[in-house]
């Protein structure tokens, strides 16, 4: 049973916001009020449907005492009772605290781990997988920075993904992705194991955090292509070091001005994510063990090419659909991760 007093508080807050916006709130308040109103609206729709179902059930049960209406009530009551548990579950999910970052664009960083050139090739495969997934969702996928490897893989890549639910769905991808397959360079047909690391960060705006200029060291250098050769003769590449944390961000596109923009965009995202992690750790030590914690050192998934199998180790999910997954069909695994995370947060909220 969902506490009715809490539901009524939400409805009253929604009605207050609606009245303020209709009356013409102060310009400085409109954005915050509109955002809260939009967040509460689907919850209020669920509450309204739930209250209507309870009222219908109460009316049907009252009809049992009327001999003329008893048969009709006995027909209606089972269906009404069957609907209510599902509506209560939908309400519980709607009442879960929202992650303020879920509505933001995502910054995606991919780097090869152990495994040499094969790891770089796999990192490139992951980048294409996410690009296809984003395109399938109707999101905008923008490659911010790419350092290719000698054989067509990547030494590192940074992308920005924008669209409804981009960070909310991609955030579960942070961690170590392991691949087991026969590399193209393997003459004897032996299976090799290598890995790549994925970091998914919510994009941060300048208003989210202030970065004093004194905290930054900005260096320029020549851009390098595959194999380390210089791709131009100007010092266009930019490396920004955040001195208090030691975080280093580089960008090596052709325009130095654009490289500064990209590097600052990624640095803001990393610092914002660092603060989010600090607050999450302070709220609950248990939260780190949950699916969406974003621990970049955690091995989250194995892609076994000989068996056509993908296993997500966090939720013990195995799918024999590896070609489709590598082609960008991530919906099933991300939906399973979302459901698992919701269940864990529900259990935490109701404990």
UniProtKB/Swiss-Prot annotation:
Membrane-spanning ranges: none
Pfam assignment, any one: RF-1
Modified residues (N5-methylglutamine): 229
Keywords: Cytoplasm, Methylation, Protein biosynthesis
SUPFAM superfamilies: Release factor (SSF75620)
Similarity section: Belongs to the prokaryotic/mitochondrial release factor family.
Stated name of the protein: Peptide chain release factor 1
Lineage: Bacteria, Pseudomonadati, Pseudomonadota, Alphaproteobacteria, Rhodobacterales
């Amino acid at each position: 049973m969902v506490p009715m007093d809490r539901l009524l508080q939400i409805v009253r807050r929604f009605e207050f916001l609606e009245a303020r916006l209709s009356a013409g709130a102060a310009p400085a308040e409109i954005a915050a009020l509109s955002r809260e109103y939009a967040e509460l609206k689907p919850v209020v729709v669920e509450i309204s449907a739930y209250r209507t179902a309870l009222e219908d059930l109460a009316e049907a049960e009252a009809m049992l005492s009327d001999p003329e209406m008893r048969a009709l009530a006995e027909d209606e009551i089972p269906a009404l009772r069957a609907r209510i548990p599902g509506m209560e579950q939908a309400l519980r999910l709607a009442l879960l605290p929202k992650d303020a970052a879920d509505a933001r664009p995502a910054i995606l960083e991919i780097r090869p781990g152990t495994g040499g050139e094969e790891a770089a090739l796999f990192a490139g495969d992951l980048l294409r997988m996410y690009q296809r997934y984003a395109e399938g969702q109707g999101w905008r996928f923008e490659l911010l920075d790419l350092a290719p490897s000698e054989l067509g893989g990547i030494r590192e890549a940074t992308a920005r993904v924008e669209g409804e639910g981009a960070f909310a769905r991609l955030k579960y991808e942070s961690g170590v992705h392991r691949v087991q397959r026969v590399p193209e360079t393997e003459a004897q047909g032996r299976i090799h194991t290598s890995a790549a690391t994925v970091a998914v960060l919510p994009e941060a705006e300048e208003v989210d955090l202030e970065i004093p200029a004194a905290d930054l060291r900005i260096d320029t250098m020549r851009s390098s292509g595959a194999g380390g050769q210089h791709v131009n003769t100007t010092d266009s590449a930019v490396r920004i070091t955040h001195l208090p944390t030691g975080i280093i961000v580089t960008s090596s596109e052709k325009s130095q001005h654009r490289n500064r923009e990209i590097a600052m965009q990624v640095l803001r995202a990393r610092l914002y994510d660092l603060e989010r992690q600090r607050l999450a750790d302070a709220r609950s030590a248990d939260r780190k063990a949950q699916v969406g914690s974003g621990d970049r050192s955690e091995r989250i998934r194995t892609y076994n090419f000989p068996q056509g199998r993908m296993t997500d180790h966090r939720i013990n999910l195995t799918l024999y659909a590896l070609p489709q997954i590598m082609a960008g069909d991530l919906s099933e695994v991300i939906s399973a991760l979302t459901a698992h995370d919701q269940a864990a947060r529900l259990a935490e909220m109701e404990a």
